[in-house]
Regions:
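Short glycine-rich beta-strand segments
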Residues: 38, 173-176
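Bacterial Sec-dependent N-terminal signal peptides
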Residues: 3-8, 13-42, 273-280
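Short coil-to-beta strand junction motifs in C2/discoidin
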Residues: 182-201
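Terminal, low-complexity interaction segments
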Residues: 195-280
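N-terminal targeting leaders for non-cytosolic proteins
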Residues: 28-153, 163
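Short edge beta-strand/loop segments characteristic of extracellular beta-sandwich folds
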Residues: 172-174, 190-191
Length: 280
């Protein structure tokens, strides 16, 4: 039995901590995708020049982690000649605790702010462990609801671009400032959460044949118990996956489905795989 640990700096500029464990013929590698470093700079919303996801995630916006090939499958929908994000993930560093700012008309155009109790308005220190960058996910799927887009599946999806299965051991989850503001205070478009209402986030894994490998659900918000800091989320039970779809659902609804903002934030995604098996 042999165990070794190494630290690798990718040529692209992303600092990754890679651990290797060799037990007989196994060679297990583990990488934490933290969205930090030079290779990520051009994808961070502040460098793109907007706080609004639909202006950041354009057709040419395609990020990929070099060590794991983790990437986002983004979907946009055109409405009135304007392209809007329907499903996807944007890299951001915006963070704020000013709930009133996210409760006025047009606040949805600041949808890339994560909630951070320590800062009124900042682009530093909003990630897990006071890091800077994270990703904001948007979209969901409510198959029993019909509306302008019918029953289309707009669950934001993370996938491995090379098509090789890996295990996402876990990640950290937080709420966006816009989500916290509306679920806590309510506005003219969506009421605040009431007693007994809750909003959940579900991760569903898929293999190379697009078969489900399992699902894991966490409660993101309840009345008087809204996620406002980074929380660890164990996704290891999904097993080896090629993609993971995230679905945010619950809270008050109308004929169109979920009324609360369909946003959440992820950071420090731990990916594990058997390097010797993938080399075959």
């Amino acid at each position: 039995m042999k165990r070794c640990f190494l630290f690798a700096v990718l040529a692209a500029g992303i600092l990754s901590v890679v651990s290797c464990t060799k037990d007989d013929d196994n060679n297990i590698k583990s990488v934490v995708v933290d969205f930090e470093g030079n290779a990520w700079k051009k994808f961070v919303a502040i460098n793109v020049g907007s706080t609004y996801s639909s202006e950041v995630v354009t057709p040419g916006y395609k990020w990929q982690d070099e060590a794991t090939t983790l990437s986002a499958d983004n979907i946009s929908t055109e409405w009135g000649g304007v392209s809007y994000l329907s499903s996807g993930f944007a890299v951001s560093s915006y963070n704020s605790n000013d709930l009133e700012k996210f409760n006025i008309y047009g606040a949805y155009q600041r949808d890339l702010y994560v909630y951070n109790a320590e800062n009124e308005d900042a682009v530093k220190g909003g990630g897990n462990g006071r890091s800077d960058n994270f990703i904001v996910g948007y979209g969901n799927y409510e198959g029993d609801k019909s509306g302008e887009w019918g029953n289309e599946d707009f669950r934001p999806t993370l996938s491995f671009s090379d098509g090789k299965a890996r295990t996402i051991k876990g990640c950290y989850v937080n709420s966006t400032a816009y989500f916290v503001s509306i679920t806590e205070l309510g506005n003219e478009f969506a009421p605040a959460l009431k007693k007994g209402e809750k909003i959940t986030l579900t991760a569903t894994g898929y293999d190379a044949m697009r078969r489900e490998t399992g699902s894991v659900t966490m409660t993101l918000a309840e009345k008087d118990n809204i996620t406002k800091s980074w929380r660890a989320w164990d996704l290891s039970s999904l097993g080896a996956v090629v993609s993971v779809r995230f679905n945010i659902t619950g809270g008050p609804t109308d004929e169109w489905g979920m009324m609360s903002p369909k946003y959440f934030a992820l950071d420090d995604i731990t990916v594990e795989w058997d390097d010797s098996a993938q080399a075959e």
